[in-house]
């Protein structure tokens, strides 16, 4: 059921939320991806202007709480490359299989997530999306499709994806190379018909978003929600190591974030409030594990 009002106060990095402990900024990380330098910049901003913690959200974003100078935080985020589009910063909600291209999955969807983010920022109509609207890209393993994103694709094979609405298979099949266009088409249609709805599941008939698309497979399939984050020592398909660490209560001390950044490896935040370090050789992974585990991160 849609809400009677359309007051979308969903916070971003520029439109912050006044919480009991001060201003709260939510930083979108499409696909959960960020660099070591970006994590370090976030940790420094949280230390200098906030509560010296970073909160991990169920949408693989990060939050800074208790902000005393919102302008300074926004400037720090922009300098770190975390605000590529001030107009679209609240709508860059993209969940993607965090281990894709490195461990398991039907195919590597990292480029797909990046292309979706880039195309989303270029579309002036999509600035009207609610801040709660979420895209999903599942590389076939079923980790993201079970999270009930508003519109998503689930890879079936190297050439085909299933189109999902509110976490449910519509029966519509789309060529993999058309997936971004299809996701954006559905999102545009949502802005046209949503009324006061913030999420696809609030529409009286989500199938209206399909337009002329006809299902070619039985619709209705859902995927179970994944509750266990990818943690521990994970051998990548290329022989290198990924380390997965659960963050207790989803609250990451800024000092611990700085230690994570010091590993100088690609990172991802997951929807299960964990962090992944990628592309490590065994020696570096072993040292990182020995340093990070005593700091309160959970690797098992």
Predicted feature locations:
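A conserved active-site cap/scaffold subdomain adjacent to cofactor or substrate pockets
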Residues: 180-183, 187-193, 240-242
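Small-residue-enriched alpha-helical segments and adjacent helix-cap loops
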Residues: 2-3, 19-164, 169, 173-181, ...
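Flexible, glycine/charged-enriched surface loops at secondary-structure junctions
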Residues: 53-56, 126-130, 191-210, 216-227, ...
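Intrinsically disordered, low-complexity polar/charged tails and linkers
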Residues: 1-16, 38, 228-234, 243
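Accessory "access/gating" subregions that flank catalytic or transport cores
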Residues: 211-250
């Amino acid at each position: 059921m849609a809400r009677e009002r359309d007051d979308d106060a969903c916070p971003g990095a520029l439109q912050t939320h006044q919480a009991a402990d001060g201003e709260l900024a939510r930083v979108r990380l499409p696909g959960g991806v960020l660099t070591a330098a970006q994590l370090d910049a976030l940790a420094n901003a949280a230390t200098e202007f906030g509560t010296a913690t970073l909160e991990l959200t169920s949408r693989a974003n990060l939050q800074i709480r208790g902000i005393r100078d919102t302008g300074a935080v926004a400037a720090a985020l922009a300098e770190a490359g975390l605000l590529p589009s001030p107009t679209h910063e609240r709508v860059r909600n993209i969940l993607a299989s965090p281990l894709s291209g490195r461990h398991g999955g039907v195919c590597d969807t990292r480029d797909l997530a990046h292309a979706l983010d880039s195309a989303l920022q270029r579309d002036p109509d999509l600035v009207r999306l609610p801040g709660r609207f979420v895209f999903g890209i599942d590389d076939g393993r079923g980790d993201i499709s079970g999270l009930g994103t508003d519109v998503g694709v689930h890879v079936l094979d190297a050439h085909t994806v299933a189109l999902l609405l509110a976490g449910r298979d519509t029966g519509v099949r789309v060529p993999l190379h058309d997936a971004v266009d299809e996701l954006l088409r559905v999102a545009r249609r949502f802005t046209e018909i949503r009324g006061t709805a913030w999420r696809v599941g609030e529409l009286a008939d989500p199938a209206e978003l399909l337009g002329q698309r006809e299902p070619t497979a039985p619709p209705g399939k859902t995927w179970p929600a994944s509750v266990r984050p990818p943690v521990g020592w994970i051998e990548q398909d290329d022989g290198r190591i990924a380390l997965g660490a659960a963050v207790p209560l989803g609250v990451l001390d800024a000092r611990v974030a700085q230690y994570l950044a010091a590993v100088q490896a690609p990172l991802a935040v997951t929807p299960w409030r964990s962090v992944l370090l990628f592309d490590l050789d065994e020696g570096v992974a072993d040292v990182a594990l020995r340093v990070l585990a005593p700091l309160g991160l959970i690797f098992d």
